[in-house]
């Protein structure tokens, strides 16, 4: 998919990456201080998910993420659940994805500059996500991800 970011926005991302890579701190220390490095748009996305999660705290049931891609949302839901409802025995977080991208795209799916292409959203993040889920469950009161 063609990037919708301006050239300046793309340069900001490269600058942040360079600062992150060149910082002498351990990676864990950098991650503990993530607001230093994360772009405003990505932090805003997480905060929006936080606000949505607060609205469903009293709603019983599971959370289903269709289209996991690299795992931002499914792991955010899991972490928000662990923080905001650590003793909820009934909430489960489910993520569904083929991780193979779109097998095909019809003309009706091509609606503008942000239109997807066959293979778009393919990612090799499945094994990484399984490992992150395992680690996440070791670091919380109750395991919510099967």
Stretches with model-predicted labels:
Residues 46-59:
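Conserved alpha-helix/loop element of class I SAM-dependent methyltransferases that forms part
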Residues 39-43, 47:
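Short, conserved micro-motifs enriched in small and acidic residues
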Residues 2-4:
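Leucine-rich tandem repeat or coiled-coil scaffolds
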Residues 7-40, 57, 62-146:
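S-adenosylmethionine/decaboxylated-SAM
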